[in-house]
Amino acid sequence: MPPDKFEFWIDLNLPPKMAEWLIENFSVVAKSFKELHFEITPDTEIYKIAAKHSNIIVITTKDVDFKNLQSAIGSPPKILYLNTGNITNENLKKLILTKFGEVLELFSDPENNFIEISQS
């Protein structure tokens, strides 16, 4: 599936400009939770909304709650879990730059619904 077939939803726990940065660097569709007006929406509701979009939505988060929701409820949506702990925005971008091509390739397989990126 080409990168423009996915829509990356960027959780509030990530830098506010992450969606814009992903668009500029990878030509993907990306929207922040703020842009989607999810500032006070519970994670369970966000998950249900994303699930209605089939396998297109990729919730990008550092929040283990979405990982747990996927374990409990199933997929869709897809989850890109950034298990990085405390990390500077610059180092987070560097990490994503090295892994994002592989992320897109793995998510192209409909069976891959969860990818975790960790610091080495």
Description of each model-found segment:
Residues 34-40:
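Short beta->alpha junction loops
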Residues 15, 42-43, 62:
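Amphipathic coiled-coil/heptad-repeat helices and related helical stalk/stem segments
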Residues 43-44, 93:
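Conserved strand-to-helix beginnings and helix N-cap segments that scaffold or border functional pockets
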Residues 29-33:
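Short beta-strand elements in bilobed, periplasmic/extracellular small-molecule ligand-binding domains
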